[in-house]
């Protein structure tokens, strides 16, 4: 029975991996866009962006998933979005808002004197950001970004709310057959994957330790 259970859980876990990977693919760059919006000197854009981030961070991801999937049809009478698409959109927006605050904190932690020094050297704003600021920001945000990435691993289980067959749902199917251990077995998938990510992120953090800016 162990092999069939493992194969079934692997099917569910593959869907969890897809949600995880696609969310990171879209949310990391989108978070930077949101960050720039929240730091904009144009007040209406800045406050609109910060209000949006506040709403997303202050409401449950589960609620956002449900609204993303059912909302367009119930509110605007539009065709339902594919389940996977709704999941990726909701997850990406949610995590982009969290990442944007991490980016903003990293950028704002750089002393103003470094920007001024770049200007004295005749560098453009883009050159100052990419050649002076960026590496220091990356060094400072690796740990908090890592925490959010590990949280995302566990949050993928929320996708089952709108019918995505992820690993925990796969484990629950065996309860109908009188087996409870497959549900505990699903925890091993999360632990192993989270452990591997923790090791990789730890190595990245150590690699950047040489830079103390």
Q: Which residues make up each language-model segment?
A:
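Transmembrane alpha-helices and adjacent helix-loop boundaries
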Residues: 1-213
